[in-house]
Each structure stands twice: as C-alpha cells, then as structure tokens.
C-alpha cells in the first residue's frame, strides 16, 4: 500500500524541461517505494503556481490519468493521508493508473481559479504520462470544480467522473462551511458555479459514479449525489453506490470498484 506522505520540509530539485500554457514545472522529486512487489514513483511539481503530486507505477505503461479533486481542509497529499485514501490510491496505481492531485488553492470550493488550475493539471499530467485518457475523481468539496469542468468541456479526454460523498449544491452546504462559501461566492455569483443550477443537459452522454453515505450528516446524499442524479440522469449515465457502514465514510473509498468501473468506461469509449 502507498505510504502516507507529508509535506516535505526540504525538497530535492531537478529541472523539468516542460512548459505548457501557464504551467511551469519548477521542481520535482521522485522516489520508489516497494510494497507487495509494486514499485511506486512520486512526482512533485508546481502547476499554475500550485503544488502538485503525482503517483504512478515505476516503469509501468500508464493506461490513464486520474485527476483527484480534494475535499475541504485538504491539499495534494489527501490521496495518501489515511488508510482509506491510501488503499484507494494503491488500487488505482497497481492497476496502471497515474493518480495526480493539486493543492488547487486549498478551500476554493470550485471557484474559477481552482478550475483553471485543475484544467492545467489535467493537461500537464496527460502530457507527462503520455496518455490521452483522463478520469476525474472527486472527494466532497472537490466535486464542485470537477462538475463545472466536466460541464464546460475540458481540453483533455475525460472518460468518466467518479466522486466520494460529493458536494454538488453550494446552497445546501453544512453550517460549518456556510461562511466560507459566502465569502467565496457573493449571492449574485453563486449560481454560475453551482452544479445543481446547471442546465439539465449540461452532462449529456457523460458517465458518472458516486459513492455516497446516506447517513452522513455533513454531506447529505438527498441534497447532493441523489439530487444530482435526479436532475441530470435523464441525459447521462449516473450510478449511486450507498456506502454506509459502522466505519463511517471509510467504506466509500472503494479502490477495487473504481478500477472495475474505470475499466468499463475504457471499453465503451
């Protein structure tokens, strides 16, 4: 399993001769970690001014890039922050996917700056790992940016969008997030970035899969994952997996199921 990573106090630098639009790779490190016969390679770089982390199998043909959109209070290290995240990321990397995450302005709640960053991250990752196939994987708050990018037509080829306890309604966030959302989105502008207010055909022909805990008091499934499926499901393919258990939301990080679903999308497109 991929070990939990912490923000390094000191970083070894090596130049990367890549320049893409506003993307400047200013520093990167890579290291290998052998676990259960799998060797991982970590890439550290800066994209659009934001720290970014990529994890892939060393010397392994990359079948697709998975762009991970982190939750509130997290950053690019979230995909290895604890056992559920680490196990999910390991399953994806072991199956041949490169998983890439960005700090993306922290608690940006899908604002224009974070969307631009993720757009550049997708293009940079696809170029670096030499693949045209990209999947979106969002966690909580990250679904706001992911959904908006998917609706506007990203420059990369997105084969599928998966999300874990996704937040899709900026007007129905938990009380602890209300002040942050209000600061980022004055009342007159929130509708332009709120996925639940997009036209019903905004995700036409898109394939999506959501892992949602119906008992989660912070991210209510009926106001987010299932409400989103009800609004957009007539023109797109959306499946919602209930993942409630005594371990809280940990059971929603289903790496093996993600690998299976991503593989199904690869066959379809």
Regions found by a protein language model. Give the residues of each.
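C-terminal motif of bacterial Sec signal peptides marking the signal peptidase cleavage site
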Residues: 27-30
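N-terminal cap/lid segment of alpha/beta-hydrolase-fold proteins
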Residues: 33-60
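Short, surface-exposed "cap/lid" segments of acyl-processing enzymes
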Residues: 48-51, 58-91
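Conserved alpha/beta-hydrolase
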Residues: 89-108
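Alpha/beta-hydrolase active-site loop
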Residues: 108-129
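Primarily recognizes the serine-hydrolase "nucleophile elbow" in alpha/beta-hydrolase
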Residues: 127, 133-189
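The feature captures the conserved acid-bearing segment of alpha/beta-hydrolase catalytic domains
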Residues: 171-233
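C-terminal catalytic histidine-bearing segment of alpha/beta-hydrolase fold enzymes
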Residues: 226-229, 233-269
């Amino acid at each position: 399993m991929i070990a939990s990573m912490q923000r390094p106090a000191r970083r070894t630098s090596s130049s990367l001769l890549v320049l893409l639009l506003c993307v400047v790779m200013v520093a990167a490190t890579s290291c290998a970690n052998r676990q259960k016969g799998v060797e991982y390679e970590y890439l550290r770089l800066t994209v659009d001014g934001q720290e970014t982390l990529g994890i892939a199998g060393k010397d392994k043909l990359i079948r697709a890039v998975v762009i991970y959109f982190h939750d509130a209070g997290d950053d690019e290290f979230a995909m290895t922050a604890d056992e559920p995240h680490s196990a999910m990321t390991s399953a994806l990397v072991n199956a041949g996917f490169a998983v890439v995450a960005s700090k993306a302005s922290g608690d940006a709640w899908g604002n224009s700056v974070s969307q631009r960053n993720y757009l550049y991250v997708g293009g940079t990752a696809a170029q670096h790992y030499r693949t045209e196939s990209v999947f979106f994987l969002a966690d909580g708050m990250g679904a706001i940016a992911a959904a908006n990018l998917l609706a506007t037509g990203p420059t990369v080829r997105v084969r599928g969008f998966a999300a874990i306890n996704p937040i899709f309604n900026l007007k129905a966030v938990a009380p602890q997030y209300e002040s942050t959302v209000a600061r980022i989105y004055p009342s007159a502008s929130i509708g332009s970035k709120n996925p639940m207010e997009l036209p019903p055909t905004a995700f036409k022909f898109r394939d999506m899969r959501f892992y949602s805990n119906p008992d989660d008091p912070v991210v209510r499934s009926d106001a987010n994952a299932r409400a989103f499926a009800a609004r957009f499901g007539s023109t797109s393919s959306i499946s919602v997996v209930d993942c409630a258990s005594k371990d809280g939301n940990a059971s929603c990080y289903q790496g093996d199921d993600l690998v299976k679903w991503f593989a199904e999308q690869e066959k379809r497109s």
